[in-house]
């Protein structure tokens, strides 16, 4: 029977992939500093460098929070163990090819005297790995030798047990992913490790104690996770937990012992849960039921420690987590629910342990506590967000939203906003593009969540469902970035510095790299890892008028020993797992920006064009270029030699100063006089604390000297313009940033760029026309009321005082949101004029299509932005055929009322529907439940806009009839 199940494949896919700035926690352990794919040896998504901000994979971004709770591993690792330099062996490293050449005796002797990470391609599937692991005799030799060493290890010598277990874990990891090794993925084969595990456990030195003993205990748990367990192996493990509990005050600050008991709990839980899913059995039908009470009781002791400290909080959380999951194997099957309910009442409301308990009751016990009371996770999560993130700030007409803790100052938020503008300006200059590659994605609105502290950031796991063993995390699927405020004692980096890095990742996803993170060929095999991380470190050095400069803090990460520095080849092919590559990837891109801009530009052009083949070839050629590597090394030495001359860019106080009023007309006049532009256009934007402007136009330069020289000339010119503006009387010019895009050469052989300026707007007293939103187009039936909406119409410097609708059939209305009935079929032009309190008017037009008979959906309507607008009491026909998997509809509810939604599945295909309210596009307001061929639900609707997704989940084709009443 296969050890891993279908659901575990999902669990593997939701492992977080690190994509972002360095955080400020303990150094990554030796175990973590390995090629990133090695960290997925457990299909549970927990083993990754804690110092990296994560950017999660496709599955985690797609699954709902509730689904992630069910399939993901939400246990919490203890703090990382400080890295210790490995003892140098006879040979620095070995490959699987080297191991294949050895006879059995040579193999076991070698494995016994090296560290597992000296095997360079362990956990990587290649022909050598396949040959090695398909040799059943060799596998048995390793298992037998592990048993021998397990029975003979001492408190001072672990006999290389960790290396043997890692080689076996690599076998099962590769077998899970590759059918060529499928025999190793059978539990019957993995059970062959049980005698070795028992030999280890029967050794009197199998206990927590010295570092060697702790290493063996950890290896025991990890091997169970990837191989298998039985009753006896679990019973032996209970002795380890009891020893830890009995010596809790002594052991709680010992990271190796913490890691060891975590590996024991996680490994056994993972194996047993996997068995349930694969065998399709209930807990009371398994060998463990009623026979591992001792192990579970020790976990329960951890769950109910009562006194939570920063040092033991991770342990308490894990105790609650595993007590819930394993409680059903206790001789008292309600024990898990009893313990988790006790924990919920024991720990402070809305604390981390409290949330873990609530989640487990929701996930494993249908939302009912031990007394039968309903536990409403959604309501509690909402309370948590209100407590930990009570403040909201909006900028740029709502396109940037900050949600923060109450201790994150308003000044800090303003500085971060202006820092984003400096980074954005330099970023667009370099890539030459400022148009979203895929407009309509969630990142049309960037949401930035900032907790008060690293401690409160841990609640992000409970409030939003994402990993917190990082310095922050950007979820491209939702356009949301999570991080926390920090003190100088907690970090050598400021929040602004880290924010600049992460904001660059947002820009990359929106303007540079096609598709969502992790999807598509360009993301495969970590092609972009070196580029995206180094790129973010590079642009964190953006300035207003001095281009992009190296940061002193990142230079400090380069080795003082030239022999220890990365080569260009190693940098270009760097992968997650080592922290150093961030620094060297920055240095390479800084070098290219400064000395080989054409090369830098070509790399980005290939990425933006999604040209995987030529990107691979170009990267390969660069990696073999000795001149590039030589100059790269010299550039790094130059940075190190001049490190004290650099600083860390941060926004100036000028951004926060009070600036005198000045009309935007006058601003535009002065700016276009300083930099002559054709077709200049001034636009005002609204933010919570202030308004801003963008001034766009086309600049024509001198006769072209080639794109690279033209770019340098333009960058110099724009910087000079910014400096000239800053010398003028109005201080607001010191907030202006600028970029230029869309390079071309005109018919006169002169280069041209589109230039965009951004700065503070202080045009107080100048009346602006209102914004009108007609919310069309509309559809309806003859002699049935059609609801027209003016939602979104606004006047930023006053209020709208009148509305005038012209329905195109000779009739009008002055209502804000009128209902109109058409007498004849046809297409009508509808106009809406709004007037503000100072007399200015704005007009917008749309169409309404009126049909005699039933309505039919209009494609495309696959996304919320394309949704077909329907009214209440509407029936509409639709189809899901071929690649058309989803139809989206939208309707408005003016006041609270009960709504019936029904979809008639006319062909019996696999389909359903879900409904979201505009205020929460992540969680369902309602969802369809099958009733024969109807998929229906009734719910009480609050006022607002709703989005209804009708979708199929198989390959069937069919039509349906949707009714909303």
From Swiss-Prot:
Compositionally biased intervals (Polar residues): 845-859
GO terms for biological process, alphabetical: proteolysis
Compartments it resides in: Secreted
The keyword Amino-acid biosynthesis is annotated on this UniProt entry: no
Region Helper subdomain, residue ranges: 653-765
Domain (PKD) ranges: 769-850
Keyword Zinc among UniProt keywords: yes
EC nos: 3.4.24.3
Reaction(s) catalysed by this chain's protein: Digestion of native collagen in the triple helical region at Xaa-|-Gly bonds. With synthetic peptides, a preference is shown for Gly at P3 and P1', Pro and Ala at P2 and P2', and hydroxyproline, Ala or Arg at P3'
Active site: 502
GO cellular component: extracellular region
Listed SUPFAM superfamilies: Collagen-binding domain (SSF89260), PKD domain (SSF49299)
Residue span of region S1 metalloprotease domain: 94-765
Region (Collagen-binding domain): 853-965
A molecular function (GO) term: zinc ion binding
Domain of life of the native organism: Bacteria
Region (Activator domain): 94-366
More info: Was identified as a promising drug target. Collagenase inhibitors might serve as promising therapeutic agents in the future not only to stop bacterial dissemination but also to accelerate the immune response and subsequently accelerate the wound healing process.
Name under which the protein is recorded: Collagenase ColQ1
Species the sequence originates in: Bacillus cereus (strain Q1)
